[in-house]
Amino acid sequence: MNQRAFQNSSTTATRELLYLRQAINVDVAIVGAGIVGLAHAYLAARAGHRVAVFERNPVPMGASLRNFGMIWPIGQSAGQLHRFALRSRTLWLEVLRQSKTRYRETGSIHAAYSEQEAAVAFEFSSKAPALGYDCEWLSPEQALACSHALVSEGLAGALWSPTEFTVDPRQLLSELPGFLSEQFGVTFYFNSPVQRVEPQKLKTPEFRCEAEHIVVAGGDDFQTLFPEHFRRSGVSRCKLQMMRTISQPEGWLLGPSLAFGLTFLHYPAFEICDSRAALKAHLEQTMPEFFRYGIHVLVSQSGNGQLTVGDSHEYGLDVSPFDDSAINDLILEYARARLKVPRLQIAEQWHGVYAWHSDHPWLFFTPCEGVRVLTVTRGNGMTMSFGLAEQTLLEMGVSL
């Protein structure tokens, strides 16, 4: 054998040996370390399964990072969606307590500042408890006693619910992988984009993995894995603009997370209200620019005291990478008229993008044996993640 042939043979053998060293064998492999992927990892690992998670970025960078951190059962449609949200809430609290990740059981207030908004809030408080919601109507005086962050002028009442709570997405996504690794032996492979998935196999540039069950939870990445399935589904994207204030004074707490009249038109839970039609007609006439950009305003507080304020909703596969300052101005104008906080100066602005489908709250594909693709398509992945993960794993035959 000449020297060149020997070198080529040696190089090939080294590569093959390296490839073998980088082979992974687990029970459950998960593509994506956003909250939906992490929920699958927690439930599978808690049940004693060997779990590996592959994330294309150094840290999760998608919708799970760029949101309010609200777990929001009050907004989910009555029936299956609301039941999933409540089950997800139970599992959320379990993992947060185990991991000692900071959260606040704040509840939520939908504050009404017009006769039409108050009518929807009151009607929902009358009908929803029979459908499994825990909520009640508050008079203006009761609402102000419950939240010192509301402007009193013009307040007509509010809808109170104790089921909502908040986490800081940045802290959560930073800490939860470490907890899963240390407590349950979950192995994380960051900077590891998955290039191909087959029955019981997946491949990255550096690793090959064999797993009895594979879950793909890639958010709005419709191009990398099984693009033909996404194409046929009619899935699209939603872009939302959000902001964070500077930190509030030490010790100042927002209390309940806040929503307002526009939110009654955004969340499907409120479709049970006959009075919603009159509110929609009123707001379309008086606030057309808010409808143009799909704006409704929510406010939550992070662990370091900052307030997260947003958001807008623009739809399409080709959502613009450029933000519109006029949208943020509208959000802040609306918030200032209803929100009484020490500091509303903005420290950060960004946009998030999530998968969207007008007909389905989530998409499930089984492109090949042992593989399940899951994408939440209504912007409620934080709320639904653990409930959906539990259902998905059970349907795949993973014992929990």
Language-model segments: what does each one mean?
Residues 1-26, 46:
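Extreme N-terminal leader/targeting segments of oxidoreductases
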Residues 26-52:
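N-terminal Rossmann-like FAD-binding beta1-loop-alpha1 element of flavoenzymes
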Residues 29-31, 194, 202, 209-221, ...:
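Short hydrophobic core segments
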Residues 46-65:
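Glycine-rich FAD pyrophosphate-binding loop
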Residues 68-146:
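Dinucleotide-binding Rossmann-like beta1-alpha1 core, especially the glycine-rich loop
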Residues 158-200, 211-213:
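Helical element adjacent to the flavin cofactor pocket in flavoenzyme catalytic cores
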Residues 208-273:
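Central helical "cap/lid" subdomain
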Residues 294-296, 302-308, 314-400:
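C-terminal catalytic lobe of FAD-dependent flavoproteins
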